[in-house]
């Protein structure tokens, strides 16, 4: 019996693991050759930053991906007060990315225009009554009369320079930049597009 004790303990442990991951009881270590299947984690709902560019989650809605792609066109542009507020049209959307710089609401507007959530740029005060109140599941604009930023797919798109937690974010300069860390929403109104 003492020689079989390690085998019995291993089988019991494998059975517990199988039950924990939802496998049928018959799928023990003995029936699977000593291994137990553990399913992969679900796909991430959070975008990733690679060399300053956001990579959208695979399962993100198409319009969310389009908003991220539009924002990627202006990332690394400098901060310019009033930048990004030229009226948009589908034909000049890419040309608008060639503005010399963007301010906070111009940055948010350009990303949202890319995802077909806006038809023309808004200033930060106008965003306070845009769309629906509260946090969205994919996109949330945080705004007050003096500043606006947006969180898309879990990443913050912001132009401000003083709240960066990571050293690489502090070195990135002012202007449209993706941030992996959120900032405090205190003093901001949260708005989101319906269904997003």
Predicted segments, located by residue:
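Residue-level detector of bioactive/disordered segments in secreted/extracellular proteins
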Residues: 13, 18-19, 106
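Bacterial N-terminal signal peptides that target proteins for export
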Residues: 1-12
